[in-house]
Amino acid sequence: MIVDGVHSHPASIALAYRLKGNQSCYLITDAMRAKGMPEGHYDLGGQDVIVKGSEARLSSGALAGSILKMNEGLKNLIQFTGDTIEHLWRVTSLNQAMTLGIDDVKGSIKIGKDADIVIIDDACNVETTIKNGKYHAFK
């Protein structure tokens, strides 16, 4: 699910999560390269994309893609579903790793798995990332 409140209404996301649960939902971003950039005009495959607020649209008004960051998607999912991060974390990583058949090394924290970890604060802001066990300061 692209949980930006633009691609899908918050009530639709809450319904899908209630019906499917945390073991069957996947949080994705489908983000284009304008993600994290200021409002303005960007190119997407030769098409002019206008980024304003949390939306990326073509000049026709059609959605051009997402500019959602994963941590913002998680924050939205918490808000839209009323569930906790203790239940929702797996929709950001483990479910995807299981589908790809790489959950033996990715998707959760366990001895023997790759240490790819994003540390967030209570407001879902990224504080630190760890990639292959190496610390990368975010701020």
PLM ranges: what are they?
Residues 1-92, 98-103, 120-125:
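Active-site-adjacent C-terminal substructures of enzyme catalytic domains
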